[in-house]
């Protein structure tokens, strides 16, 4: 029996993955889902507890809880890492704070199982903005604006990916990075078409439903993509919801701007103090 673990199933990405797995997966699949709120998950998937094909086991807990993670990751060959935070608040560390205990649990399994240990594959949602080949397709000024506004979120994801890269070198896990463009229609449930890419042209918008289907295909073809970044592009019509994205950009940009101004103010104050001290020393000569 193949086992998939899904972290963050109540978010737009996680729910789209779960929906696709429930509809398209073989009956032999076993899905282990870790969520903060089981009630919220069952509101979105009311038949989940009675589903027998595929089998679904729901674990309530935090993505930083070692016991909950150990239960969720047990025997999993694929781990969908969909824990994320809307916006880009300064200082966010959610992705890396989740990556560290995941790696720790897998290291414990590696030590206990010894030579029989089979590393699982982490399928980590990233962004086309962090993929040089795909980011180069976007006008430079747009890329700079987005990178400025989502700086904290991107820094968090990059650090988490660095942890996975280091763990891969130790044989603890494999990883695949999934790089979609802007994501839309969080409430949509029907894919309209997508294609996996590396450096080919990427459409500006992709629906969450198509992202979920794409991540499931990537998991099915995992051996082709280990240690690589995989882009996703839409091939069908996408219901675009730019208002949500613009709000996240505005919130992230405002936070980054306030941080930048605060840092500059500190530098100015230190410089003023230095000049005052220097003036006092010179007047005493």
Swiss-Prot record:
Tree of life domain: Eukaryota
Glycosylation sites: 75, 187
One Pfam family hit: NAD_binding_10
Top-level class of the enzyme under EC nomenclature: oxidoreductase
Keyword Phosphoprotein assigned: no
Topology relative to the membrane: Single-pass membrane protein
Any GO BP: aflatoxin biosynthetic process
EC number from the UniProt entry: 1.-.-.-
Pathway: Mycotoxin biosynthesis; aflatoxin biosynthesis
Keywords: Glycoprotein, Membrane, Oxidoreductase, Transmembrane, Transmembrane helix
GO cellular component, one term: membrane
InterPro entries the UniProt entry points to: NAD(P)-bd_dom, NAD(P)-bd_dom_sf, Polyketide_Oxido-like
Disulfide bonds, paired cysteine numbers: none
Transmembrane regions listed in the UniProt entry: 265-285
Location in or out of the cell: Membrane
Keyword Oxidoreductase in annotation: yes
Molecular function GO terms recorded: oxidoreductase activity; oxidoreductase activity, acting on the CH-NH group of donors, NAD or NADP as acceptor
PANTHER family reported for this sequence: FLAVIN REDUCTASE (NADPH) (PTHR43355:SF2)
Family named by the database record: Belongs to the avfA family.
UniProt name for this protein: Averufin oxidase A
Gene transcribed to yield this protein: aflI
């Amino acid at each position: 029996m193949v086992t998939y673990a899904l972290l963050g199933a109540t978010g737009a990405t996680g729910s789209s993955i779960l929906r696709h797995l429930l509809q398209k997966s073989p009956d032999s699949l076993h899905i282990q889902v870790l969520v903060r709120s089981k009630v919220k998950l069952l509101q979105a998937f009311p038949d989940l507890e009675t589903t027998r094909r595929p089998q679904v086991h729901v674990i309530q807990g935090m993505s930083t809880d070692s016991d909950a993670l150990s239960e969720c990751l047990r025997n999993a060959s694929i781990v969908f890492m969909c824990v994320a935070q809307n916006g880009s608040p300064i200082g966010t560390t959610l992705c890396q704070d989740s990556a560290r205990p995941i790696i720790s649990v897998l290291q414990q399994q590696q030590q206990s199982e010894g030579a029989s240990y089979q590393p699982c594959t982490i399928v980590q949602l990233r962004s086309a903005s962090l993929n040089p080949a795909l980011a180069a397709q976007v006008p430079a000024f747009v890329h700079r604006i987005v990178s400025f506004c989502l700086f904290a979120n991107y820094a968090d994801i990059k650090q988490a990916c660095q942890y996975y890269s280091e763990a891969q070198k130790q044989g603890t896990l494999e990883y695949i990075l999934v790089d979609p463009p802007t994501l839309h229609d969080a409430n949509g449930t029907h894919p309209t078409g997508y294609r996996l890419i590396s450096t080919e042209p990427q459409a500006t918008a992709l629906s969450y439903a198509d992202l979920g289907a794409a991540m499931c295909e990537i998991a099915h073809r995992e051996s082709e993509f280990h240690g690589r970044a995989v882009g996703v592009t839409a091939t069908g019509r996408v219901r675009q919801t730019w208002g949500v994205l613009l709000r996240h950009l505005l919130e992230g940009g405002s936070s980054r701007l306030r941080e930048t101004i605060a840092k500059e103010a500190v530098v100015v104050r230190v410089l003023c103090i230095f000049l005052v001290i220097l003036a006092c020393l010179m007047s005493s000569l």
